[in-house]
Each structure stands twice: as C-alpha cells, then as structure tokens.
Amino acid sequence: MKKLLLLFMLFSNVTFAQMAITHFNAEWNSANDVLWVMDLEDCKTISYSDIAKDTESQVKHKIAVVPTIIIFKDGEEVARFQADLSFKMIATKEEVQDEINNQMMSDF
C-alpha cells in the first residue's frame, strides 16, 4: 500500500502539455485542404484559419504558403509543416502524428 501511495504522489504532480493544431489555408486553395488533419490524435484543439479572411493570424504566425499546419504545445509553436510550390501539403498524416507523439513524450 505504501508503494502505491508513493507512486500516486510521484505522478500526481505530472501535468501533460496541451497540444493544439491549426490548419491554415485559403478559400481559393480549398482544393488542397488537408482533410486528415481532423483525424489527428492527442490534440486538445484542432482549428482552421482562412488567411484571406483572418489576415491578422497570417501575419502573427508568418504564414507564407498554404496550406500550413502548425503544432502548438502550451501555446508555443513547436512544429510547422508547409505546402510545396504547387500549394499541396507534402507532409503526411503519419509524419504530423509522429511529431505530436514526440512532443507528448518529451514531457516524460
């Protein structure tokens, strides 16, 4: 019982990072929306931003090409995936999910 209590006390102070994803694109490039972004796991928030309508967000996050996917950990950018010159996302769902997993595991 003492060991169980000790383990509980050790891990009760562990807090997990809040992971969030923002998918930046524009209406004129909707054919290249990254549809699988909504299937990513272990993210508290997955959001979409149309940079043509939300220019403030475009400037704030320095979006130069769309689509762009940014992973935020506790509100700070930790990874960015951008489209190629043809405005198509080159990263795969697996690559983005691997980065999310790596960020989550870095807390341990």
Regions found by a protein language model. Give the residues of each.
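Short, flexible, glycine/charge-rich loop motifs used to bind or transfer phosphoryl groups or to couple energy/partner
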Residues: 11, 36, 59-60
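Local sequence-structure signature of Cys/Sec-based thiol-disulfide redox active-site neighborhoods
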Residues: 16-49
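Non-catalytic, surface beta->alpha helical segment in thiol-disulfide oxidoreductase systems
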Residues: 71-108
